[in-house]
Swiss-Prot record:
Mn(2+) 1 binds at D129, C132, H237. It comes from Ostreococcus tauri. Its EC number is 6.5.1.8. GMP binds at residues 236-240, 363-364, 412-415, 419, 438-441, 514. GO terms for biological process: tRNA splicing, via endonucleolytic cleavage and ligation. This is RNA-splicing ligase RtcB homolog. GO terms for molecular function: GTP binding; metal ion binding; RNA ligase (ATP) activity; RNA ligase (GTP) activity. SUPFAM superfamilies: Hypothetical protein PH1602.
Length: 515
């Protein structure tokens, strides 16, 4: 691997902060020079309160007693390091839920010009849980109907959907079926009877990335994925029964089949499980070899990458597409199980309960898209890590049903807090490559959360709020407690006020199922 650029001498916080300037009430700019070799600026969407959080993290990093101990660099440094990657255009963009991660910060968007032969693809810009995403189903049920049975319904969901670390799926999957899943995505779900035709229409990429090549997925990745189809997993993944709490845009909400406060919806948050993690892990070794061969230098080893046009780059994109297809089938399988649970509870088939998919979005993926850069339409490889595609009205890649509203964007809150449906805007298309936030974003590490919170207290608070809770690993709930995250409403409002997405519906949970 080519040597990483030598780090600049340690600077004081004041030295570092001089490179971070306020553009407006919703945005700060990280100027070139903040880290070596920046080709574009960093642009971070934050309001005053969220700005204070990212600057506090930078201040802690600059304190000689608080850093140099390993771990991730602060989010501002990671955003700037991405701005130094070959072929990057526009800006390295961070959304309000940004926090440090592996390579790219979580909440980072970066686009690379396919027409530039030096442009790269980086697994760190997608993440280990490839196509981690969110799906929302609506129903014609009301809180008055579901509230009295929410405990039983939460238990039914918990019984139907395998959850937790190492959970095994109940959707029968043979090695041959897995090959088809990796290649076909939701077309497999449709063929096998686990999805409705409209589900596919209301899924990003229509639930299938066409460049998928199962031969590029390792045997180990397939072995990990085989038993996990239709499983929720652990961490911040969940299935929630939610009710409509507020409607901000009645026209858009009605297009989504949401027409009243108190209407019951179901949100599913999960990804590609062990298969996606293994695809990412496998790619890093190949990327390091490619960097050494092609003389690619990066500021951080975790930004291992390869030229898009290289064999390594193409192999990763083909394997990543397989993992993305797996994730869509995984969420489709859980949708099937969720529909079964509701049908059993209410004694009606799912179609009579109007259990249609509103939309399914990915927030860990890299895709080829057309965007305007400096007045010229270009094909870009857009990396979205912990950020969501948010295309505007009339965009050709969003469903007919949403041509007048813009793409629905699903923003999951933290355990026990509200979630949101947003819609994409033209301003977002211009300013953020058609991207917005994906959730609340961590404010406290998992490790710190485990040390300062008690799981009994977290569960008791949820019960006090009237939320039914089923958890496979109770001692891990501290990691996902609301206190461990930023305020999702602050995050969503920042994006709304900046004009990069528009608030449509607010949802609140009445039952939560977690791993």
């Amino acid at each position: 691997m080519a040597p990483a650029t030598e780090a600049a001498p340690a600077r004081t916080y004041d030295d570092e902060a001089a490179y971070v300037t306020v553009d407006d009430a919703h945005r700060v700019r990280v100027a070139r020079g903040f880290v070596p070799n920046m080709r574009v600026d960093g642009v971070v969407y934050v309001n005053a309160a969220l700005r204070a959080l990212v600057l506090e993290e930078l201040a802690a990093y600059c304190d000689a007693t608080a850093h140099r101990g390993g771990g991730y660099s602060p989010a501002l440094k990671q955003i700037a390091n991405v701005a130094a990657l070959p072929g990057v255009v526009g800006a390295s963009i961070a959304l309000p839920d940004v926090h440090s991660g592996y390579g790219f910060a979580i909440g980072n968007v970066a686009a690379f010009d396919v027409g530039d032969e030096t442009s790269i693809v980086s697994p760190g810009g997608v993440g280990f849980d490839i196509n981690c995403g969110v799906r929302l189903l609506r129903t014609n049920l009301t809180e008055a109907e579901v509230g009295p049975v929410k405990e039983a319904l939460a238990q039914s969901l918990f019984d139907h959907i395998p959850v937790g670390v190492g959970s095994r799926g109940i959707i029968p999957t043979t090695p041959a079926a897995l090959e088809a899943v990796l290649e076909m995505g939701m077309d497999w779900s449709l063929r096998e009877g686990y999805a409705w035709a409209e589900d596919k229409e209301h899924t990003e990429e229509y639930g299938r990335m066409l460049n998928a090549d199962p031969s590029k997925v390792s045997a180990r990745a397939k072995k990990r994925g085989l038993p996990q189809m239709g499983t929720l997993g652990a961490g911040n993944h969940y299935a929630e029964i939610q009710v409509v709490d507020e409607i901000y845009d009645e026209f858009a909400a009605k297009k989504m089949g949401i027409d009243r406060v108190g209407q019951v919806c179901i949100m599913i948050h999960s990804g590609s499980r062990g298969l996606g993690h293994q695809v990412a892990t496998d790619s890093l070794t190949a990327m390091e070899r490619a960097m050494e061969r092609d003389g690619i230098e990066v500021n951080d080893r975790q930004l291992a990458c390869a030229r898009i046009s290289s064999q390594e780059g193409q192999d990763y994109l083909a394997a990543m597409a397989c993992a993305a297809n797996y994730a869509w089938v995984n969420r489709s399988s859980m949708t099937f199980l969720c529909r079964q649970a509701f049908a059993k509870m209410f004694g009606k088939p799912p179609d009579e309960l109007d259990m249609h998919v509103v939309y399914d979005v990915s927030h860990n993926i890299a895709k080829f898209e057309e965007h305007m850069v400096d007045g010229e339409m270009k094909t870009l490889l857009v990396h979205r890590k912990g950020s969501t595609r948010a295309f505007p009205p009339h965009h050709p890649l969003i469903p007919v049903d949403y041509q007048y509203t813009g793409q629905p964007v699903l923003i999951g809150g933290t355990m026990g807090t509200c979630s949101y449906i947003l819609t994409g805007t033209e301003k977002g298309m211009r300013d953020t490559f058609g991207s917005t936030c994906h959730g609340a974003g961590r404010a406290r590490s998992r490790n710190k959360s485990r040390h300062v919170l008690q799981y009994e207290d977290v569960l008791e608070k949820l019960k006090t709020k009237g939320i039914a809770i089923r958890v496979a690993s109770p001692k891990l709930v501290m990691e996902e407690a609301p206190e461990s995250y930023k305020d999702v409403t602050e995050v969503v409002n920042t994006c709304h006020d900046a004009g990069i997405s528009k608030k449509c519906v607010k949802l609140r949970p009445i039952a939560v199922v977690k791993g």
